[in-house]
């Protein structure tokens, strides 16, 4: 019995470290169960307490783009429908600030709402419209699509500019309602998560370090490893792969 307990504790520590020390008992229990371990979340929590480990996070400093267009011409097509049934049906985008000792840098991200995957991102030293356009172009190239899809954002000046409208000419533009930031909750939640789980652990020196940290979190953890409750406790990448397999008839979903 003691041997099994120690073996489970070793697995808990491995999963904990692999998650960049972000996973608490619920997610660690899910990972153990996926590998065939029969264990309750409460037991995992008990073992973690005995081991002196817990999910690490730092409260994020919050700031967002300011709405610059309050006209009635911008419509909320998405209307908080955050669960599309396929990839490339709805993208959402937002800009967030990251503090460094040399000053703020700015992260523009685009998320595919189907899988919550970050499909494109750009870190820059300014908040120019060109940074958003670069991110849009990356997303279009990576997803290899030229279809009319919905792209949702807030009403910041970058997202209501003529350059943005040109870059998204074949897409349906959707905007958060006036003073309703939660209309873009999924991407804003991701930015908060990035800071809480990773960025705010560090005193970031400069742009290069900020870029490396963002790259490590998004490309080496969030998209590829971090399990997401919305995705049935698998990573965004795995969720999209599962969709492809089901769509090709390679496997059948139970139910």
Residue ranges and their predicted role:
Residues 1, 38, 82-83, 100-101, ...:
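Conserved, non-catalytic sequence blocks in retroelement Pol enzymes and Pol-derived host proteins
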Residues 1-86, 180, 235-244:
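Basic, flexible linker segments flanking DNA-binding modules
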Residues 12, 28, 44, 48, ...:
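Mobile genetic element proteins and their domesticated derivatives, centered on retroelements
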Residues 48, 127, 175-177:
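Methionine-biased hydrophobic packing positions in alpha-helices, especially
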Residues 64-68, 153-155, 161-165, 175-195, ...:
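RNase H-like two-metal-ion nuclease catalytic core shared by retroviral integrases
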Residues 80, 84-119, 125-126:
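An active-site-proximal beta-strand-loop segment
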Residues 99, 103, 121-144, 160:
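Active-site beta-loop-alpha junctions of metal-dependent nucleic acid enzymes
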Residues 169-171, 193-255:
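C-terminal domain-tail junction helix/linker
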């Amino acid at each position: 019995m003691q041997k099994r307990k120690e073996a489970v504790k070793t697995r808990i520590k491995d999963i904990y470290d692999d998650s960049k020390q972000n996973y608490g008992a619920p997610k660690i229990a899910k990972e153990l169960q996926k590998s065939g371990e029969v264990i309750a979340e409460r037991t995992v929590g008990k073992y973690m307490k005995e081991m002196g480990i817990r999910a690490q996070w730092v409260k994020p400093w919050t700031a967002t783009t300011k709405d610059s267009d309050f006209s009635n011409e911008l419509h909320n097509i998405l209307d908080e429908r955050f669960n599309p049934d396929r990839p490339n049906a709805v993208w959402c985008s937002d800009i967030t600030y990251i503090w460094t000792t040399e000053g703020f840098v700015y992260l523009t991200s685009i998320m595919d709402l189907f899988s919550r995957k970050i499909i494109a991102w750009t870190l820059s030293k300014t908040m120019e419209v060109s940074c958003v356009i670069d991110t849009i172009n990356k997303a279009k190239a990576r997803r290899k699509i030229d279809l009319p899809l919905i792209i949702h954002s807030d009403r910041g000046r970058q997202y209501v500019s003529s350059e943005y409208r040109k870059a998204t000419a074949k897409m349906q533009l959707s905007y958060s309602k006036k003073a309703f930031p939660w209309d873009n909750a999924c991407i804003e939640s991701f930015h908060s998560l990035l800071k809480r789980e990773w960025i705010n652990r560090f005193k970031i020196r400069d742009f290069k370090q900020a870029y490396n940290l963002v790259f490590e979190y998004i490309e080496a953890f969030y998209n590829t490893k971090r399990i997401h409750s919305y995705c049935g406790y698998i990573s965004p990448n795995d969720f999209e792969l599962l969709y492809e397999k089901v769509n090709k008839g390679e496997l059948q979903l139970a139910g």
